[in-house]
Structure formats: structure tokens, C-alpha cells
């Protein structure tokens, strides 16, 4: 008889190699065919709900790793909540309006000048819907589960109607108004931008110091004195109407070689250095407070215009001269302080950034090119004291990457000032995973200006505003709701297809239009108003969802974006935050922490990861990141992730192979009758389960990633499964010792598969399909393991044993190196107490020590002679085992015997083989 035939070797069809790129789509097809998304909802119908509201990605372009990070994190959460019994619908969404789609069509050769606005918008819509289908396919390929057959899309008529109603309610409360104010203006996009559409890059700019002569000294300063201003935007000097000083700062009149200059005293040294003044020739003649300088009149350096000295609290001594060049048409602080003094708002720049006729001799010049012309003129007039160039952080258009300017134009605004405190209060009542998240959005709301909600484009939701013949604005509850009803029925394109009178309620009249003629607003809404209306357009509209959402989760850039616009519109109309809990993640960088770019050749995209390695590798990578900060990805990092995956897969496969002949309904051993080592592992499983559930609850996936590896590698592979081979393969099939271990092994396999399911969605499903006797058709329709109290005394006892076992392994390794033994089964271990640990007493309660240490013989004595090696948990001696090697189990025994014709079997193997012969 071949002894191998008598061994109970592992058997499973679960393959060693994952083959994920080919296998995952098959698993997904099965899920789709079974409509698993709705099955999971049906299972938990009537239970407590959990609503994670999806922030809509922009419907343009291929997915990047940031998209993958975001959607996979959301999927972890929703799948976990579902397995915890929550009714957790997930409705993905898309943001579809805005400039990038207009630009994409232009790149494709669509000439908008050859078609009507309505026709061009139709093409934009078609393009957006095509992009959604492509992105949808890629999101699903990542294993993300949701209602992809019925997502929310910001261009859908019912969504646009909800957005218009929010606008109307805000208008009713006096929160929407029109004004000429300086706003971020992008000449490259020919449109105003919100703060969320601004990003900062380094820019080289002119740095100039300019002298303004005093025209009317008001009896305060010397008539021949000059104010010095500093600016990095020479092109705004033609729009100067004032010089702002801080009322509480000290200012000095300095005589420098006969010239009298007024600057802040705190900046005098810095100015002297910048202007190369000889400090020995500088004399402080007079001192004033900024308040005393108020209403002194200076003369514009080259225009026939006065420049009034005014007070403003925004003036600092961080840089410059303490005398701030003020052009209300080109700066927010300038505008605000200018309103107080009723200063004119001059902004002689057109949509393209070119000087208009109002710009006089600069007419026709691009603003940036005008910098040189202005400095040349200042030099000619003797007003330019210094020209230099500096590189500084400057606002750019987030789409075109070109610099932006502040420009006063007629715009529509949503008032932040009127609801700011309410929003801040709502933030205080919102939960955050990390305090800095709360601080970040709180400070952004606290410090932000009014929200420019108008855009001078065509692909977006129109502002539902009409104008009477006399120019009066018509924006009533009646007219706005009528437009909302029209949009709900026909979509917003109707605004561009019908005349104004046909968009107003039937029979509508207005005293400002005696002839019954009306015009309509041509601007559209900021796309952040679109996505920021999703709490109404989605949460309050879809029957399976509810308001407010339990959670919003997006990239950290959304503190100024979607998080901000959503809470603004929600607080303004509903009085509460649209989210109860806010969580954010960082950006995806390359392996060295650098930004990914095609030029650096360091770009990794989801499609590439999925095709080469599989979605489960991408998902495992997400779980391995500290996602609250920026995360890293590279081929090397993905290789490490794949290695971890392989270990997880092989451990699960080993367990599957060893429970192939086990039926939990008939073969399970009651817990009270389990071997103590098995009870220890059962309690370790419970401990691991409690920790994993806690980590899921706290969104700590990195902890799960690390603890899974620790449990699988240290507890299972390095100990329990290694120890178990001598039992699972060698003992009789139905023996108590084998069934005891299989009982626990089965529990570990089932619970581990469930705990891994939200992360390794495909692999967990594959394991489940190979696990015998499971009740649910899919692991994703099963419940998470329950948290059970652990036997702490048992855990403490066995932790001490595991430490002692580590000492034995160290001793075995030394003996191996000294050629005393080869494999550990060739060893006889003698353990004794020492000064550090009473090993002999401790080990009295342990059975089958030779199996636990994976050696042939173990002897425990009170004391050993000086030849023993002292370890932390006892003195240990390793010798070669006594007797001969059993040809079946490879343990050494002095009692080898025969069964019929079979020789060289230890007593245990003799007994097992007898039962088979």
C-alpha cells in the first residue's frame, strides 16, 4: 500500500491562480443576471437605512485613479452596511453641464456658429450621455455595485426642475441678486469663475513701486509729499481711484534726498531696501495714523483723475508699503471698501481680457501685454520708482490652466453673507472623521465671498430670470415655478427654443412692460449650483433615498466644491446640512509622491490595473492606503499588493481544501468539546472579527488590510494551519481531534470570506461558491459575522504560549544551522523553567506539545544543566529525536511497528491504517 493513499490531502476546485482579469467579468455578469443590487436591497427592506450620496463625477474623459479610489471607498462602505442589515441604496450620479464639454465638442470639429444654441446644446447632451456610458462601464468593472441602470444625471429634466425650485426659494428669501462686482474672470474661458474653479500656480509678474503726488493735503501732509504704492498688476493702474491705508497703522513722511514719501513706518526698512535708498539719507519728518490721512487727495500718475486716500482694515504690513493701490473694478477688497466711499467701479477690460475704449491709449491691448505699456508711461511721467519681476502663487483657471483676473461685470450672486452664520452652525452640527475636515470647510465658509452663480456660456441650466421693457428684473415665485414646471416636462433646452413671452405664465403682465414685451436672461448657472442641488434633485426626489444623507465622501478638493455648494443651497432652503457625516480622501500620486503626468510617464489608470491585474488588486490597493492624506501608486506598489493578495488567496484555498469532507450540520463539534487550541483560534477569530467590524465602522481600511495579513500569516499560516497538517492529513477522517479543527477552520473560512467581501468582492464570491454547505447564494447577500464576547483568560494563556513557541522556533533554527537537525520533525525539545519564566508549571495544562511545536518529541522538566540556552520563556535544549521516522506521518517514534505487511508506522498511524485495511 502506498501510504500517500491513506492521507487525507486537501481537495478543492478553487484555483491557486486568481486569473482575475478574465474571471471577474464572468462573476459580474452573474450578479447582473441575478440583479444582485436589488436583491440586496430587498433582503434588508424595512430595516434602518443608510444613505451614502454619490458626488457626481464630471461626464468627460476616461477614469483616473482618483475616480477609482473614490468609488471603491464608497463601495466598501455601502457593501459593509448592506451586510450589516442596513437598507443601503447607492445611486451613482453624473455632473453633465459646463465648459469642458463645450470645449470637447469644439475639439471634435463642431462649429457652434453654424447652428442654433438649442442645436449645440443637444450635441452637448449627446456627448455627455456617451461619456456617462463609458464611465459607467469602467466603474462597474471595478466591482462597484449600485443602481447603474437608473443613475441620477444633472441634465435630466426632473433634476433641472428641482434646481430651478432651489433657485426660486433662495430668490424668495432675498438671497439671489444681480450686481456689478469684481469676480474671478477667465479671459481664456471668457467667463466668470467661482472660487471652486480656481487653482494656484506660480506666475512671473512685474513688481512696481509707484509715486502718487499729493493734490489736496487737507492741512495734514506736506503739499509736495507723495504716497508710494506697490502692485504686481500694473495693468490695473488705469482703473485706480483710491489709495487705502489702515486707520490704526502708523505712517511716516520720509525725506529721501529732498523727496518726501509717505509709507507705513513698519515697512520703511523693507521699502528702503527695495528702492535702494541710502539709509543715512532717510529722515522721518512727520508721523500720522492712517485715520488722520483719510480724505487726503492724491493725483493719478498719468490720468486726469483724483485718487482719494481712504481707510480699510484689509491693509496689512506683510508686504508692500502700507499704502494700497485701490481699483474697485479689479479687486474684491477694493470693491468692498470702495462701496463705503461711493467710489466709481472702473473696469475697462472686455470678455477676452482686452482693454476697451474706456481704457484710453491702452485700447485693444491684452491686459498682460499692457503691463509694459503702463510701466513705460509711468517711467515717462517720473512716477515709477522701481520695476522688478517676482515669481509668486497666482490664481489660474482650473480648466484652461491660464491666469485669471478680477474684473467687474454684471453678474448674478447668491448671498453668502446672509446665510453664513446658519451654514457655520450647520457645520458645527455635522460629524467628521477628522477634526481638520471640519476646520477646513468651516474656515472656507467663514472666509468666502459672495457666490457668483452666473456663467456666460450656453451648456448649462439657464437662470430663470426675465426683464421687463424698462429693464426691471422679473424673478417671482410664480415665474420661477412656471419655468421649473416647463423644464420638468421639456428639459431646459426649451429656454433656448421659445421666446421669453412663451416661457412666462399664460396672460402674465408687468407694469414695466406696457407693450407686453419681455426678454430673458442669457447667462447659465454655475455648475456647482447644478451638483449642489443634488440633495433636492436626488435625495428628496427618489423614493428609495432620504434627506439628509447619512454621508458624503469625496476628494479633499470638494471642501471648496461640492461639499460647500451643497451645504449652502441646503441650509438656504431647508435650514440643515444635506449630510450628517463628512469624509474626504486625498489625491493619488505616483510612487514617489509626485503628481501623475503624461510628460513624466508616471500615469497609472484604472483600466490598465484592471486589465493587467484585476479589480480586486485595485480594491486591495485602496484598502492599503492611508486615504485621508494623498496616496501613492506605482507598478512596484501594485506588485506588493499582488503578493499580499496571493497570500490571502492561498490561505483561503488551503482552508477550502481541508473542509471538503466536512458538513457543519452533521460534523461540527460543540464549542465546549473543542480542543483547547481550537477554542483559542475560535476566540482569536472573534477578536479579529470585533476589530474588523470596528474598523469598518470607523472607515479604517488600512487597519483591516494590516490585521488581515497578521491574522492570516501569523495566526493561521505560521501556526494553526501548519500545526493542523499533522491532524487534517494524518488523523482518522471522523476523529474528534480532526473534526474539532475542521469545525473552527470552517468558521474561520466563512467569517473571513464575509469580512473580506466588501473589499475583495470577486474573490470572496469565488471562495463562497466553492465553500460547501453555505446557505446564501452569494456572500454579498449574507450578513456580517456577529461580534461575540471573547474568553480573555484563554487568549492571555495562549498568547503566552505563542511567545514560548517563538522561543522554541528560535532554538530550532539555531539547531538547524548547527546541523543538529534538518526538518523540525527530526527534533526532540526539552524545556525547563528558568529565572525569567516557570515553563514547567505553565506547560502542565497543554496537551500534544509535540504537535503544537511541530516536532517529534517534547520533554518538560523543572531544571536543565548549563548546556541549555536561556530564553525569555524558559531554558531550551534541542536534540535529534529518538527512534526512527514513521513513513506515513514523518514523526520520529521509538515504537515503530507493523500492520500486516506495512512496517515503520508509529502507533497512531498503525491505528489509522488498520481502520482502512
From Swiss-Prot:
Keyword Protein biosynthesis: yes
Record's comment describing the protein's domains: IleRS has two distinct active sites: one for aminoacylation and one for editing. The misactivated valine is translocated from the active site to the editing site, which sterically excludes the correctly activated isoleucine. The single editing site contains two valyl binding pockets, one specific for each substrate (Val-AMP or Val-tRNA(Ile)).
Function as written in the Swiss-Prot or TrEMBL entry: Catalyzes the attachment of isoleucine to tRNA(Ile). As IleRS can inadvertently accommodate and process structurally similar amino acids such as valine, to avoid such errors it has two additional distinct tRNA(Ile)-dependent editing activities. One activity is designated as 'pretransfer' editing and involves the hydrolysis of activated Val-AMP. The other activity is designated 'posttransfer' editing and involves deacylation of mischarged Val-tRNA(Ile).
Localization of this protein: Cytoplasm
Group of enzyme by EC: ligase
Free-text cofactor note: Binds 1 zinc ion per subunit.
Alphabetical list of InterPro entries matching this protein: aa-tRNA-synth_I_CS (IPR001412), aa-tRNA-synth_Ia (IPR002300), Anticodon_Ile_BEm (IPR033708), Ile-tRNA-ligase (IPR002301), Ile-tRNA-ligase_type1 (IPR023585), Ile-tRNA_ligase (IPR050081), M/V/L/I-tRNA-synth_anticd-bd (IPR013155), Rossmann-like_a/b/a_fold (IPR014729)
Stored CDD domains: Anticodon_Ia_Ile_BEm (cd07960), IleRS_core (cd00818)
GO MF annotations, alphabetized: aminoacyl-tRNA deacylase activity; ATP binding; isoleucine-tRNA ligase activity; tRNA binding; zinc ion binding
UniProt-listed Enzyme Commission number(s): 6.1.1.5
Chain positions of motif 'KMSKS' region: 595-599
Chain residues that bind Zn(2+): 886, 889, 906, 909
Top-level taxon in the UniProt lineage: Bacteria
TM region positions: none
Binding positions for ATP per the UniProt entry: 598
Annotated L-isoleucyl-5'-AMP binding sites: 554
Cofactor: Zn(2+)
Motif 'HIGH' region mapped to chain: 57-67
Membership in a protein family: Belongs to the class-I aminoacyl-tRNA synthetase family. IleS type 1 subfamily.
Record-given protein name: Isoleucine--tRNA ligase
Amino acid at each position: 500500500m502506498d501510504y500517500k493513499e491513506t492521507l487525507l490531502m486537501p481537495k478543492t476546485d478553487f484555483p491557486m491562480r486568481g486569473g482575475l482579469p478574465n474571471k471577474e467579468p464572468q462573476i459580474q455578469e452573474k450578479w447582473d443576471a441575478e440583479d444582485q443590487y436589488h436583491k440586496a436591497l430587498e433582503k434588508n427592506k424595512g430595516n434602518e437605512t443608510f444613505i451614502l450620496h454619490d458626488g457626481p463625477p464630471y461626464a468627460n474623459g476616461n477614469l483616473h485613479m482618483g475616480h477609482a479610489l473614490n468609488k471603491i471607498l464608497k463601495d466598501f462602505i455601502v457593501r459593509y452596511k448592506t451586510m450589516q442589515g442596513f437598507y443601503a441604496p447607492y445611486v451613482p450620479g453624473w455632473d453633465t453641464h459646463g465648459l469642458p464639454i463645450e470645449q470637447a465638442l469644439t475639439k471634435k470639429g463642431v462649429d457652434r456658429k453654424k447652428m442654433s444654441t438649442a442645436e449645440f446644446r443637444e450635441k452637448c447632451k449627446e456627448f455627455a450621455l456617451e461619456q456617462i456610458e463609458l464611465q459607467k462601464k469602467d466603474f462597474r468593472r471595478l466591482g462597484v455595485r449600485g443602481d447603474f441602470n437608473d443613475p441620477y444625471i444633472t441634465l435630466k429634466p426632473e433634476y433641472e426642475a428641482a434646481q430651478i425650485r432651489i433657485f426660486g426659494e433662495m430668490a424668495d428669501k432675498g438671497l439671489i441678486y444681480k450686481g456689478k462686482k469684481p469676480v474671478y474672470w477667465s479671459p481664456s474661458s471668457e467667463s466668470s469663475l467661482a472660487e471652486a474653479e480656481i487653482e494656484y500656480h506660480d506666475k512671473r509678474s512685474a513688481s512696481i513701486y509707484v509715486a502718487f503726488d499729493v493734490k489736496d493735503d487737507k492741512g495734514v501732509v506736506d503739499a509736495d509729499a507723495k504716497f508710494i504704492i506697490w502692485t504686481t498688476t500694473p495693468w490695473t493702474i488705469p482703473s485706480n481711484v483710491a489709495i487705502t491705508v489702515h486707520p490704526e497703522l502708523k505712517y511716516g513722511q520720509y525725506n529721501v534726498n529732498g523727496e518726501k514719501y509717505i509709507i507705513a513706518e513698519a515697512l520703511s526698512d523693507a521699502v528702503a531696501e527695495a528702492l535702494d535708498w541710502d539709509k543715512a539719507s532717510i529722515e522721518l519728518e512727520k508721523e500720522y495714523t492712517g485715520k488722520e490721512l483719510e480724505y487726503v487727495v492724491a493725483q493719478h500718475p498719468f490720468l486726469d483723475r483724483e485718487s482719494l486716500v481712504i481707510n480699510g482694515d484689509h491693509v496689512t504690513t506683510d508686504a508692500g508699503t502700507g499704502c494700497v493701490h485701490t481699483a474697485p473694478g479689479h479687486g474684491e477688497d477694493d470693491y468692498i471698501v470702495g462701496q463705503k466711499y461711493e467710489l466709481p467701479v472702473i473696469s475697462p477690460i472686455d470678455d477676452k481680457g482686452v482693454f476697451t475704449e474706456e481704457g484710453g491709449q491702452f485700447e485693444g491691448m491684452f491686459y498682460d501685454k499692457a503691463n509694459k505699456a503702463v510701466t513705460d508711461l509711468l517711467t515717462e511721467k517720473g512716477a515709477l520708482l522701481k520695476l522688478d519681476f517676482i515669481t509668486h502663487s497666482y490664481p489660474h483657471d482650473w480648466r484652461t490652466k491660464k491666469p485669471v483676473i478680477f474684473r467687474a461685470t454684471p453678474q448674478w450672486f447668491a448671498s453668502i453673507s446672509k446665510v453664513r452664520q446658519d451654514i457655520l452652525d450647520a457645520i458645527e452640527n455635522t460629524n467628521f472623521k477628522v477634526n481638520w475636515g471640519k476646520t477646513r470647510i468651516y474656515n472656507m465658509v467663514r472666509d468666502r465671498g459672495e457666490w457668483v452663480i452666473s456663467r456666460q456660456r450656453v451648456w448649462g441650466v439657464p437662470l430663470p430670470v426675465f426683464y421687463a421693457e424698462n429693464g426691471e428684473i422679473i424673478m417671482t415665485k410664480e415665474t420661477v415655478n412656471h419655468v421649473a414646471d416647463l423644464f420638468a416636462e421639456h428639459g431646459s433646452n426649451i429656454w433656448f427654443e421659445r421666446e421669453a413671452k412663451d416661457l412666462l405664465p399664460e396672460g402674465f403682465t408687468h407694469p414695466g412692460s406696457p407693450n407686453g414685451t419681455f426678454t430673458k436672461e442669457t447667462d447659465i448657472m454655475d455648475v456647482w449650483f447644478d451638483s449642489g442641488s443634488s440633495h433636492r434633485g436626488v435625495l428628496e426626489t427618489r423614493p428609495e433615498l432620504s434627506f439628509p444623507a447619512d454621508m458624503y465622501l469625496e476628494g479633499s478638493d470638494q471642501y471648496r466644491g461640492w461639499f460647500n455648494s451643497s451645504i449652502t443651497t441646503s441650509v438656504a432652503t431647508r435650514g440643515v446640512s444635506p449630510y450628517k457625516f463628512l469624509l474626504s480622501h486625498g489625491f493619488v500620486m505616483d510612487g514617489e509622491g509626485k503628481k501623475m503626468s503624461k510628460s513624466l510617464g508616471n500615469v497609472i489608470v484604472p483600466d490598465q490595473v484592471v486589465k493587467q491585474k484585476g479589480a480586486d488588486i485595485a480594491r486591495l490597493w485602496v484598502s492599503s492606503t492611508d486615504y485621508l492624506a494623498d496616496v501613492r501608486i506605482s507598478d512596484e506598489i501594485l506588485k506588493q499588493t499582488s503578493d499580499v493578495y496571493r497570500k490571502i488567496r492561498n490561505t483561503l484555498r488551503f482552508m477550502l481544501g481541508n473542509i471538503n469532507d466536512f458538513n457543519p450540520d452533521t460534523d461540527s463539534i460543540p464549542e465546549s468539546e473543542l480542543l483547547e487550541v481550537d477554542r483559542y483560534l475560535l476566540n482569536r477569530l472573534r477578536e479579529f472579527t470585533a476589530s474588523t467590524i470596528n474598523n469598518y465602522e470607523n472607515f479604517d481600511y488600512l487597519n483591516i488590510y494590516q490585521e488581515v495579513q497578521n491574522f492570516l500569516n501569523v495566526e493561521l499560516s505560521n501556526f494553526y494551519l501548519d500545526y493542523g497538517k499533522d491532524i487534517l492529513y494524518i488523523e482518522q477522517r471522523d476523529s474528534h481531534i480532526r473534526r474539532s479543527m475542521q469545525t473552527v477552520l470552517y468558521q474561520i473560512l466563512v467569517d473571513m470570506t464575509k469580512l473580506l467581501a466588501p473589499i475583495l468582492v470577486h474573490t470572496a464570491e469565488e471562495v463562497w461558491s466553492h465553500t460547501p454547505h453555505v446557505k446564501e447564494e452569494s456572500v454579498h447577500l449574507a450578513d456580517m459575522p456577529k461580534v461575540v464576547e471573547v474568553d480573555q483568560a484563554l487568549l492571555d494563556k495562549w498568547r503566552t504560549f505563542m511567545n514560548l513557541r517563538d522561543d522554541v522556533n528560535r532554538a530550532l533554527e539555531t539547531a538547524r544551522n548547527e546541523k543538529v537537525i534538518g526538518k523540525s520533525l527530526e527534533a526532540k525539545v526539552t524545556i525547563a523553567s528558568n529565572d525569567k519564566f516557570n515553563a514547567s508549571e505553565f506547560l502542565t495544562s497543554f496537551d500534544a506539545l509535540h504537535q503544537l511545536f511541530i516536532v517529534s518529541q517534547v520533554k518538560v522538566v523543572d531544571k536543565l544543566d548549563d548546556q541549555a540556552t536561556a530564553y525569555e520563556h524558559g531554558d531550551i535544549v534541542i536534540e535529534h529525536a529518538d527512534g526512527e521516522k514513521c513513513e506515513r506521518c514523518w514523526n520520529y517514534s521509538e515504537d515503530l511497528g507493523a500492520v500486516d505487511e506495512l512496517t515503520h508506522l508509529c502507533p497512531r498511524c498503525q491505528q489509522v491504517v488498520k481502520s482502512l485495511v
